[in-house]
Regions:
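Structural signature of eukaryotic scaffold interfaces centered on beta-propeller domains
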Residues: 8-28, 38, 74-93, 131-140, ...
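Conserved blade-ending motifs and adjacent loop-strand segments that build the rim/top face
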Residues: 176-187, 214-227
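First exposed extracellular module after export/assembly in secreted or surface-exposed proteins
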Residues: 10-16, 23-30, 36, 47-51, ...
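Short, solvent-exposed loop/turn segments at conserved positions within beta-propeller repeat blades
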Residues: 1-12, 39-48, 100-103, 151-156, ...
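Extracellular distal adhesion/interaction modules in secreted or cell-surface proteins
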Residues: 1-10, 29, 34, 39-41, ...
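Asp-box/WD-like beta-propeller blade repeats and closely related beta-sheet repeat scaffolds
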Residues: 34-101, 123-128
Length: 227
């Protein structure tokens, strides 16, 4: 049905899928992905639910599909784009996070050897803006950074959370705003001391995660020179 007037978007959401090993059988994996629809209200796509599939890997690099398109967690709400996962403190299981747009809640899901378990909607003590963005988890799993490009606003609002990998809980740590392009990504240093992000399609900034005011700690470490 593809034509000049109909475009096959596929899965159009940044950070909209993740693959995790099955904690009960390492020859299998879970694929977590979004169900998104074009939303004329905001001129882009909105995620209304998350789905799961499970695959069995073979030694010849082929795989079998065990199941697909199984919903989990809340449905018919408006999710922010990112879904992120961090390993449980037990070293085996996984916590999954997906934020609910324009609310004070995120969806918490546990993946253990018996499957995916909805742990409900959790209030991190912070209103989640009505926008879209990207997120990342630090290498050692201690922090989550998420940025929101607010509809009709040129600023990127960046929020930091401490992660309790035993309970899966997020605790608000700090936030700042940055004039930027739409949806820049984030990267942590291996030590988790520094966070990096870009602005205005030209500048690369470094932030000190140990600072009392993370936003005020920014240092320009790179600038686009046209190659």
């Amino acid at each position: 049905w593809y034509s000049d007037n109909d475009y096959a978007f596929g899965f159009p959401i940044p950070n909209g899928a993740i693959i995790l090993p099955d904690p009960g059988d390492l020859s299998q994996s879970y694929v977590i992905y979004c169900f998104a629809e074009d939303d004329v209200r905001v001129g882009t796509f909105t995620v209304f639910k998350w789905l799961s599939a499970k695959i069995k890997h073979h030694k010849d690099d082929t795989f079998d599909l065990i199941y697909k398109d199984i919903p989990f967690g809340a449905e018919n709400v408006e999710f922010q784009y990112p879904i992120k996962a961090v390993r449980h403190a037990n070293g085996r299981d996984w916590w999954l996070y997906s934020f609910i747009r324009n609310t004070e809640s995120y969806q918490l899901t546990l993946l253990d050897p018996t499957g995916l378990h909805d742990k409900g909607l959790v209030n991190p003590g912070l209103h989640i803006p009505n926008g879209a963005g990207l997120a990342t988890i630090s290498p050692q799993g201690n922090y989550l950074a998420i940025g929101f490009a607010i509809w009709g606003n040129d600023d990127q609002h960046v929020f930091f959370f401490d992660i309790d990998r035993c309970s899966g809980a997020l605790a608000f740590k700090d936030s700042f705003s940055l004039a930027t392009q739409l949806w820049p990504g984030f990267g942590f240093s291996a030590s988790e001391k520094f966070l990096y992000t870009s602005s205005e399609y030209n500048y690369l900034w470094q932030f000190d995660m140990d600072a009392n005011d993370i936003g005020a700690s920014r240092v320009l470490v790179g600038e686009y020179d046209g190659f």
